[in-house]
């Protein structure tokens, strides 16, 4: 039985058609996604070309792949790498080699799995390319003609200058190979089709500035997308993406990225280090649980929409996004229980939506958001400020928090005076200094980590860290 070939449905299908005794058919689920994407597989000429394209070594590759057994859990591999690093740091090379042998075995097994999966993936992509080429041939001969697609292909092949291609809502199952010859392409719109993948060959479009593949059935983006160094606008919303490739961080010219309406569970770790020119980031309606720390490096970000996710906490470093004007963190429901004090460093913020969460208090330093015009705190168990105050808009909330801040300062000053009298003037100031150092350390402790509960599970007093930082 072939090893997990549902990851490579086209290869599995062609192998079964070639030798049904040796190779099992794809699962029903795989066939349901495969056949709509490759509707002409029943064509004898196409199937013949696909069969001839399969490497002669595929049987040996599958045999070895089957003999490997299950791939190690990613967490186990990560732990093994960590253990090896620890051992290498603490022992001599000879001792380390022996001590780390069992962990090295886990890593090697994972690497072998990765190597063989890459071979199968390459074969899958080659079959897809062959299929595309054969369909194009049919287009040229007048079969299955889509006039708009054919016109684009003819212009591209004639050597004409083509900078913009709009093939939105054309029921495309694949992207014709000839597209990758249009090296001067600046704008490509393939939205509203039935595409399930983007070939690696997209990297040939070096001048591409805007790519719209929204409203398709994409489950992944190719790593080669990171080679589109002139790309300024990327729209991949309304697909089936579970992750964005790490290589997207190389698209340093990106100004707008829309990855909303997908199934993303995380963002690439280094995304912020590369996308420092990004101004708009739309990641709403996904399954994100946290922001990577590097998001604070997106210094030019003006618009961030992350509503309808599963976000548990906001990194304190969000305060570094000082150009941010619109921030929507609404509808993270039971997951988001607080925001860090540093959110008040976003002094250019005009719109803030924190509705439909579990926030009990906003930072006491909230009055610093002087440019805030729109504020939505609905559907939160608010205590500070009260629901009555919160519903009256940004200006009222800002004034309420300004007064509260003044009261806190006055109370602190009065407490210092009382302590000074109680301990004597000199000793009182010593007490005050000790108290302030202790509180400052406490504030820093609260500041490290994410907005919401403290590391020991207790609730943080809103505004404390900012208060002591200011003093």
From Swiss-Prot:
LRR repeats lie at residues 159-182, 183-205, 206-229, 231-251, 253-275, 276-298, 300-321, 324-346, 347-369, 371-392. SUPFAM superfamilies: L domain-like. A motif (GVYW) lies at residues 393-405. The keyword Coiled coil applies. Pfam families: LRR_14, LRR_8. Keywords: Coiled coil, Leucine-rich repeat, Repeat. Residues 106-133 form a coiled coil. Widely expressed but preferentially in roots. GO terms for biological process: microgametogenesis. The keyword Coiled coil applies. Leucine-rich repeat protein that likely mediates protein interactions, possibly in the context of signal transduction. Belongs to the SHOC2 family. This is Plant intracellular Ras-group-related LRR protein 2. It comes from Arabidopsis thaliana. The lineage of its organism: Eukaryota, Viridiplantae, Streptophyta, Embryophyta, Tracheophyta.
């Amino acid at each position: 039985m072939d090893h997990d070939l549902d990851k490579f449905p086209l290869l599995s299908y062609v192998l079964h058609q070639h030798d049904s005794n040796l190779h099992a058919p794809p699962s029903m689920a795989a066939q349901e996604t495969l056949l709509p994407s490759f509707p002409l597989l029943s064509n004898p000429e196409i199937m013949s070309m696909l069969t001839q394209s399969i490497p002669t070594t595929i049987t040996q590759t599958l045999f070895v792949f089957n003999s490997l057994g299950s791939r190690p859990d990613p967490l186990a591999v990560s732990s093994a790498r960590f253990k090896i690093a620890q051992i290498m740091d603490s022992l001599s090379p000879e001792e380390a080699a022996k001590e780390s042998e069992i962990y090295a075995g886990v890593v090697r097994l994972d690497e072998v799995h990765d190597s063989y999966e890459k071979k199968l993936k390459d074969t899958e992509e080659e079959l897809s390319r062959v299929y595309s080429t054969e369909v194009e041939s049919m287009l040229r001969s007048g079969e299955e003609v889509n006039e708009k697609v054919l016109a684009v292909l003819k212009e591209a092949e004639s050597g004409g200058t083509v900078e913009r291609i709009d093939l939105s809502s054309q029921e495309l199952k694949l992207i014709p190979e000839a597209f990758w010859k249009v090296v001067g392409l600046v704008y490509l719109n393939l939205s509203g089709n039935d595409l399930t993948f983007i070939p690696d060959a997209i990297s040939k479009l070096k001048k591409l500035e805007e790519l719209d593949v929204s409203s398709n059935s994409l489950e992944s983006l190719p790593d080669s997308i990171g080679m589109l160094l002139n790309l300024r606008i990327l729209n991949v919303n309304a697909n089936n993406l579970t992750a964005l490739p790490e290589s997207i961080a190389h698209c340093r010219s990106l100004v707008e990225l829309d990855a909303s309406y997908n199934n993303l569970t995380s963002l690439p770790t280094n995304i912020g280090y590369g996308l420092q020119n990004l101004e708009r980031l739309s990641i709403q309606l996904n399954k994100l649980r946290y922001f990577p720390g590097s998001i604070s490096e997106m210094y030019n970000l003006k618009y961030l929409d992350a509503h309808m996710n599963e976000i548990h906490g906001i990194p304190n470093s969000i305060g570094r996004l000082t150009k941010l004007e619109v921030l929507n963190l609404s509808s993270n429901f039971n997951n988001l229980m607080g925001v860090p004090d540093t959110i008040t460093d976003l002094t250019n913020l005009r719109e803030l939506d924190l509705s439909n969460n579990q926030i009990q208090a906003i930072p006491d330093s909230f009055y610093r958001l002087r440019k805030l015009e729109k504020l939505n705190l609905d559907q939160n168990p608010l205590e500070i400020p009260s629901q009555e105050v919160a519903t009256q808009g940004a200006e009222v909330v800002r004034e309420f928090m300004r007064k509260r801040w003044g009261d806190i300062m006055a109370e602190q000053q009065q407490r210092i005076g009382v302590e000074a009298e109680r301990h004597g003037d000199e000793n009182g100031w010593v007490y005050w200094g000790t108290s302030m150092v202790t509180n400052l350390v406490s504030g820093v402790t609260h500041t490290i980590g994410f907005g919401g509960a403290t590391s020991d599970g207790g609730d943080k007093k809103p505004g404390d860290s900012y208060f002591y930082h200011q003093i």
